[in-house]
From Swiss-Prot:
This is Outer-membrane lipoprotein LolB. It comes from the Bacteria. One of its GO terms (cellular component) is cell outer membrane. Its main location: membrane. A lipid is attached at C22 (N-palmitoyl cysteine). One of its GO terms (biological process) is lipoprotein localization to outer membrane. The gene is lolB.
Length: 207
């Protein structure tokens, strides 16, 4: 009996530790719901950016073609922007100027084309499917018209899924530039049925 009693009391501290370990609450981390006030505040800050410029690296990858270029995006108002793609030598491959109701595209031969649908015009002339209307929002870290998105632990856009006319785009936000206020994306990737668009923003200028 004495031996059993000593053995019993010797196990008590270990049993107490195990029990305590089982009752320690597990931290679930901060809530990052799209309805959280932190996200709403960040979203409002982004929506107020009416004029900005960003430049960096562009890649369009599909089974039919691969395009690598430098890009420059200049937004002068919510409905006016300019997209410039240049080759490694600095020569212009494509310049797109969008204004309300009219879009002008200039190719690498200097030929100009005019349309009222920038996305359709780029696809017909270059073969690249680029969701420009949505990209204006996505490049800032805004979800645009889709309610299907998730946030990271800093209440910034992490991933979104956008569906329109039977086409589904998935956008992954891979890195943010925290040297600007509010923080803006520095790397993101768009995927749609075998097509990939990669954007790396080297710099942001907010006006």
């Amino acid at each position: 009996m004495p031996m059993r009693k000593r053995h019993f009391y010797r196990l008590l501290p270990l049993a107490s530790l195990l029990l305590a370990a089982c009752t320690i609450p597990v931290s679930k981390g901060p809530a990052t719901s799209p309805t959280s006030p932190q996200w709403r505040q960040h979203e409002q800050q982004l929506q107020q950016l009416g004029q900005f410029e960003t430049r960096g690296a562009f890649a369009y990858l599909s089974d039919k073609q691969k395009v690598y270029a430098r890009f420059f995006w200049q937004q002068t108002s919510p409905e006016r922007y300019r997209l410039l793609l240049t080759n490694p030598l600095g020569s212009t491959e494509l310049e797109l100027v969008v204004q309300p109701g009219v879009t002008q595209l200039t190719d690498n031969q200097g030929k100009r084309y005019v349309s009222d649908d920038p996305q359709e015009m780029i696809q017909k002339l270059t073969g690249m499917s680029i969701p420009l209307e949505s990209l204006r929002q996505w490049i800032l870290g805004l979800p645009g018209d889709t309610p299907n998105f998730t946030l990271d632990d800093k209440y910034r856009l992490k991933k979104l899924t956008y569906q329109q006319n039977g086409v589904t785009w998935v956008v992954d936000y891979q890195e943010y530039n925290t040297q600007v206020t509010p923080p803006l994306p520095s790397r993101l990737e768009l995927n749609q049925d075998g097509q990939r668009i990669k954007l790396k923003m080297d710099s942001w200028t907010i006006k």
